[in-house]
């Protein structure tokens, strides 16, 4: 099995952190390849950066997905998810949707932890778009830019655990979801400190991608996620232009 870890922002260290965390979870025989955006924000955190990231994501998918069995979107905004599911003949799994689906299996009301006060309104829109708005019972912001540095994720563990336990006590959450690809692999570190199940999105996405590949999940041939064909374009990468014409992209 060959899985593509795709990071639509331009922070190489985030891609490496996610890829290393996924490799540590991977079953024998599973190969992890990685790709990072060549343009756009260092960290995606605004509507404008998200719009740029959508373009970066589909360019990366068109170039790097051929030969892979599934794509893992390593951005907690699930950047390029719907476009990827349309464009590619292989499963595309994104970390926040995967975390929400997992949280639903572990409890009812969930809490959400993020690392930028501005981002919570954007995450609420994402959560509602995935159909989980009614289950969002609480959120907390651990307002630290340190988490976005190569050394910073470990430094916020105590604050994240405190935030989760506070939501459990004050708001009655039954599950906690951690945002941010930079927190990939944090679940086992945090769980012993927390009184409710902790779901880290990349772990959830990886396991779901593995399962979809093993299930032999098929590509829709009709409807909104059928592959595009005959779409002409200008000013985009050759691989993406070919995919829009119906000339390639992923395993068929």
Give the residues covered by each predicted segment.
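Short, glycine-/small-residue-rich phosphate/pyrophosphate-handling segment
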Residues: 13, 104-141, 154, 211-250
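Short, acidic/small-residue loops that bind anionic groups at enzyme active sites
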Residues: 85-106, 189-209
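N-terminal glycine-rich anion-binding loop in soluble enzyme alpha/beta folds
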Residues: 1-56, 115-153
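Glycine-rich phosphate/pyrophosphate-binding loop and the adjoining helix
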Residues: 59, 144-183, 194
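Periplasmic-binding protein-like
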Residues: 5-6, 65-75, 172-181
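C-terminal alpha-helical cap/extension of soluble enzyme domains
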Residues: 21, 25-27, 33-40, 44-49, ...
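Glycine-rich, highly charged phosphate/nucleotide-binding loops
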Residues: 46-66, 155-163
């Amino acid at each position: 099995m060959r899985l593509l870890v795709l990071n639509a922002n331009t922070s190489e260290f985030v891609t490496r952190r996610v890829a290393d965390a996924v490799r540590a979870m991977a079953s024998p025989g599973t190969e992890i390849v990685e790709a990072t955006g060549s343009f756009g924000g260092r960290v995606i955190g605004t509507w404008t950066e998200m719009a740029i990231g959508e373009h970066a994501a589909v360019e990366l998918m068109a170039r790097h997905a051929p030969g892979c069995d599934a794509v893992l979107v390593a951005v907690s905004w699930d950047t390029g998810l719907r476009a990827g599911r349309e464009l590619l003949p292989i499963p595309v799994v994104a970390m926040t949707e995967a975390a929400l689906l997992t949280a639903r299996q572990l409890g009812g009301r969930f809490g959400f932890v993020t690392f930028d006060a501005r981002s919570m309104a954007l995450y609420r829109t994402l959560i509602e778009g995935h159909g989980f708005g009614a289950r969002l019972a609480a959120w907390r912001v651990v307002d630290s830019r340190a988490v976005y540095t190569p050394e910073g994720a470990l430094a916020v563990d105590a604050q994240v655990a405190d935030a989760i336990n506070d939501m459990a006590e004050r708001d009655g959450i039954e599950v906690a979801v951690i945002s941010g690809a930079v927190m990939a692999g944090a679940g086992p570190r945090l769980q012993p400190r927390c009184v409710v199940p902790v779901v880290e999105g990349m772990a959830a996405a990886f396991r779901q991608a593995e399962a979809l590949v093993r299930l032999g999940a098929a590509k829709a041939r009709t409807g909104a996620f059928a592959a595009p064909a005959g779409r002409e374009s200008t000013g985009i990468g050759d691989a993406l232009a070919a995919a829009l014409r119906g000339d390639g992209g992923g395993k068929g």
